[in-house]
Swiss-Prot record:
The gene is Necap2. Residues 165-198, 245-266 are annotated as: Disordered. Belongs to the NECAP family. Interacts with AP1G1 and AP2A1 components of the adapter protein complexes AP-1 and AP-2. Interacts with the GAE domain proteins GGA1, GGA2 and GGA3. Residues 249-266 have a biased composition (Low complexity). A motif (WXXF motif 1) lies at residues 243-246. GO terms for biological process: endocytosis; protein transport. Expressed in brain, heart, kidney, liver, lung, skeletal muscles and testis (at protein level). The modification Phosphoserine is found at S181. This is Adaptin ear-binding coat-associated protein 2. It holds the Pfam family DUF1681.
């Protein structure tokens, strides 16, 4: 045993009883009813300690702490600690002295909760010992450990709901951008009402497009409303500005340039 290993305390119970047990003649388990339970051979304190992989059951005096007996346990359950067949409060432990002599004695608890704690403390210790052994084996042989299998088994299928994915993508989509004109200006939507608004020039005035005077055309079925756009030749209108320069019928086009805002000024 290494010198660097330290001793830890796993469980302490203030009162336990020790009994002399008759030798077992057959392979059947021990029975506490065969002991003299009303006349224990010794009573005192119990401590379970651990040093490395070995646990030690120590029976000590309540007042002075003097060691009465000690039972080293290297495996649980095993021959070092056995439960009786007729009660959960009594056990048979194998004690040893420093000279290698061994003896089996009966160990009893006055409360079932103390007996439960005694049993669980030993179970937890040897569960930890088992884990440490597995970790040591994996460290020595890392390739021998279980490998993660992410493949599909025979007949295994999965389901993907594409409809829900499309709904989520549509809800999280960005709004469409407004169409822009050739000059980079955003086009405003048409006014509500279903009828396009018309602008009628004052009486006696004419519109000039590209230096030519034109008369406003009357659209059939419009109730006499005049159309804003002049009925000029497409070739001549294409050479002018996209909206055209509108001037009054004074005889000469306006020399003042109009701002290219896209709106008709009168």
């Amino acid at each position: 045993m290494e010198e660097s290993e330290y001793e830890s305390v796993l469980c302490v119970k203030p009162e336990v009883h020790v009994y002399r047990i008759p030798p077992r003649a057959t392979n059947r388990g021990y029975r506490a009813s065969e002991w003299q339970l009303d006349q224990p051979s010794w009573s005192g304190r119990l401590r379970i300690t651990a040093k490395g992989k070995v646990a030690y059951i120590k029976l000590e005096d309540r007042t002075s702490g003097e060691l009465f007996a000690q039972a080293p346990v290297d495996q649980f359950p095993g021959t070092a600690v056995e439960s009786v067949t007729d009660s959960s409060r009594y056990f048979v432990i194998r004690i040893e002295d420093g000279n290698g002599r061994r003896a089996f004695i009966g160990l009893g608890f006055g409360d079932r909760g103390d007996a439960f704690d005694f049993n669980v403390a030993l179970q937890d210790h040897f569960k930890w010992v088992k884990q440490q052994c597995e970790f040591a084996k994996q460290a020595q042989n890392p390739d021998e450990g279980p490998k993660l299998d992410l493949g599909f088994k025979d007949g295994q299928t999965i389901k993907i709901n594409i409809a829900n994915m499309r709904k989520k993508e549509g809800a999280a989509g960005t709004p469409r951008a407004r169409p822009t004109s050739a000059g980079g200006l955003s086009l405003l939507p048409p006014p509500p009402g279903g009828k396009s608004s018309t602008v009628i020039p004052p009486s006696g005035e004419q519109l000039s497009v590209g230096g030519s005077l034109v008369q406003p055309a009357v659209v059939s079925g419009s109730g006499g409303a005049t159309e804003l756009w002049p009925q000029s030749k497409p070739a001549a209108a294409a050479t002018a500005d996209i909206w055209g320069d509108f001037t009054k019928s004074t005889g000469s086009p306006s020399s003042q340039s109009q701002p290219g805002t896209g709106w008709v000024q009168f």
